[in-house]
Amino acid sequence: MLAAGRDGALLRFSLGNEYLKAGDAGRAAPHLAQAVALDPDYTAAWKLLGKALAENGQPEEALAAYRAGIDVARRKGDKQAGKEMDVFARRIEKALAADRPQSEGR
C-alpha cells in the first residue's frame, strides 16, 4: 500500500503494531512516528510509539512520546489512555533517575 502511494496514519499504526508484535521495535518506531506526524491526535499511536522507543532502548525519546500522548489524551478526554501512558512515563522516569550517577542528582 505504501508503494502504491496509499499512506495514512492507520496504515502506519498497523505496520508499527505488526513490527512490535514480531519483536522488531526498531522497525516499528519509524512507522509509528509517521502515524503521529500524519495524525497528531492519534492517542493509540502515541502510546505504541512510546512502547516501541522504550523497547528499542531509547528511554528519553519514549518519555517524550508518552508525554505528548498524555497531552493529546487529556485534550481529547481520553482518560484511560492518558492514565496508561502516565504509568509508563513514570516507570521510565524512575529508571532514568536510578541510572543517573549520584553526582548528577545534586
What is each stretch, according to the model?
Residues 4, 38, 55, 72-76:
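Structural marker of alpha-solenoid helical repeat scaffolds
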